[in-house]
From Swiss-Prot:
Pfam family, one: Trehalose_recp
PANTHER family associated with the record: GUSTATORY RECEPTOR, GUSTATORY RECEPTOR 5A FOR TREHALOSE-RELATED
Cellular location(s): Cell membrane
GO MF, one annotated term: ligand-gated monoatomic ion channel activity
Cytoplasmic side, ranges: 1-100, 152-183, 245-250, 366-420
Keywords: Cell membrane, Membrane, Receptor, Transducer, Transmembrane, Transmembrane helix
Family: Belongs to the insect chemoreceptor superfamily. Gustatory receptor (GR) family. Gr5a subfamily.
Name of this chain's protein: Gustatory receptor for sugar taste 64e
Biological role: One of the few identified sugar gustatory receptors identified so far and which promotes the starvation-induced increase of feeding motivation. confers responsiveness to glycerol and is required for feeding preference for beer and other sources that have fermenting yeast.
GO CC terms in record: plasma membrane
């Protein structure tokens, strides 16, 4: 029987299909192996990332405060160069930089705005609302000047801080190294978000007057911009450009007012963390056999931290004073205004959110600031755990220093931020509120602004 070959074209197509399916079957095994390798590589990369996260943070103050300083420079505060560096020796200040020019121009605008506010209060309208606006812009002008002055000293302060940190017992656990940075980041995010919400609600409440009694009925944007800076435009002819400039100044001033508290809180948390680092180290060794050299080294570290706290306080005491005096004034003013009827729901929401946020911010600021003093006194508790046979003259000297020193931030030496300051602030608020209520006249719903 003769062998038939069939159609050569069909035969070639059939053979190509057979080869294709054979290759695909082999390829499926290869693909499956590649998929397993890919999954294993993902797991390996994830594990490596975990190990890298452990060493991502060094635990230094410069590393923790870096995001705060970057945000500050966006809003024309703290014009220090290379704040994104993890090393304090990289920080520099120079007058001839974009940051410094930006900060100086902003300070100039704050000063001009304050001057117009003074003129408005003295010659046009002297009442509680106008004085409150004047106090706000004057305090912002002083705050911006204080931060510019601090920026000139900051590189030296950061280097001193880094030297003190280098001599402290090392932070061994990754959780300990990232704790300070995460704490300061949380403070910054929460406070900045609340400030943003407060400002948005302020603009929404201002929209009530834009709709009810606009400056120009057919130009709502211009009416809004005019209303944002109406005290200045009483003396200066309004233009769209000046309206935008006025709104920018208003936003920058609002952030500067809130950043004042954020910065003092961040510095307080960092100083308290360094004292806590030393205290935890002594607590671990307190019940164990210790030597004179051990307590001598601990006392030197404690003394270095006290000197660092004093150096920082000398640099930021003006900012601290402005911070607490501002909060005290505006809390009294807002509590007094709480008895006024509100013209719209947005006014009511904005007012109560602003009051609660201000009260909470002041309370948290007081507690964070007082934690420095609390941690500086904590060694007295640790010393009681030391066995009698290991008690020595060096430890006695250390105990006397801790007992005699009063380590805390101050408001230009007028007051010290200890835990008792919370009660003092509350008592002062109640006292001033009672005085203000005696002079409080009949309250009415604020009407449209007069030309």
């Amino acid at each position: 029987m003769a062998r038939t070959t069939g159609d050569p074209a069909k035969r070639r197509r059939c053979m190509s299909r057979i080869k294709f399916w054979r290759r695909s079957r082999v390829g499926s095994e290869v693909v499956e192996k590649d998929t397993k390798r890919f999954k294993l590589s993902l797991i390996k990369a994830w594990l490596l990332r975990i190990r890298q996260e452990d060493y991502k943070y060094s635990g230094s103050f410069q590393e923790a405060i870096k995001p705060v300083l970057i945000i500050a420079q966006i809003f024309a505060l703290m014009p220090v160069r290379k704040v994104s560096s993890k090393f304090a020796e990289d920080l520099t200040f120079t007058w001839f930089s974009v940051r410094s020019y930006y900060a100086l121009v902003t300070i100039l605008f704050f000063g001009v705005s304050s001057g117009y506010m003074v003129a408005f209060v003295t010659s046009v309208s002297f009442n509680f609302d106008s004085v409150e606006t004047l106090v706000f812009y004057l305090s912002i002008f002083l705050i911006s000047l204080s931060f510019f002055q601090l920026a000139r000293k900051w590189p030296e302060i950061a280097q001193s801080w880094q030297l003190v940190e280098a001599k402290l017992p090392p932070l061994k656990l990754p959780k300990e190294r990232r704790s300070l940075a995460q704490h300061i980041n949380m403070i910054t995010i929460v406070a900045t978000t609340c400030s943003l919400v407060e400002h948005i609600m302020s603009m929404l409440s201002m929209g009530y007057y834009v709709n009810s009694c606009p400056r120009w009925p057919d130009r709502p944007i211009d009416s809004f911009l005019y209303l944002s800076f109406s005290s200045v435009f009483y003396f200066v002819d309004y233009t769209r450009f000046l309206g935008i400039v006025g709104k920018v100044v208003n936003v920058l001033s609002t952030f500067a007012w809130n950043f004042n508290d954020i910065f003092v809180m961040a510095v307080s948390v960092a100083l308290a963390a360094r004292f806590r680092q030393l205290n935890d180290y002594m607590m671990r060794e307190a019940r164990l056999p210790t030597t004179v050299d051990y307590w001598m080294q601990c006392r030197i570290n404690f003394r270095n931290l006290c000197k660092l706290c004093e150096e920082v306080d000398d640099a930021i005491s003006t900012i601290t004073l402005l911070c607490f005096s501002n909060n005290l004034y505006f809390i009294c003013g807002k509590i007094l205004k709480s008895m006024q009827a509100k013209p719209s729901i947005w006014h009511a929401l904005y007012f109560w959110f602003s009051l609660v946020y201000l009260l909470g911010r002041t309370l948290i600021l007081s507690l964070y600031s007082s934690s420095i003093n609390d941690e500086s006194k904590r060694p007295l508790v640790i010393f009681r755990l030391v066995p009698r046979e290991y008690w020595c003259d060096e430890l006695k000297r250390f105990s006397e220093e801790v007992q005699m020193d009063n380590v805390a931030l101050t408001g230009m030496k007028f007051f010290r931020l200890t835990r008792g300051v919370v009660i003092s602030v509350a008592g002062t608020i109640v006292t001033y509120e009672l005085i203000l209520l005696q002079f409080n006249g009949e309250e009415k719903v604020p009407g449209c602004f007069e030309n």
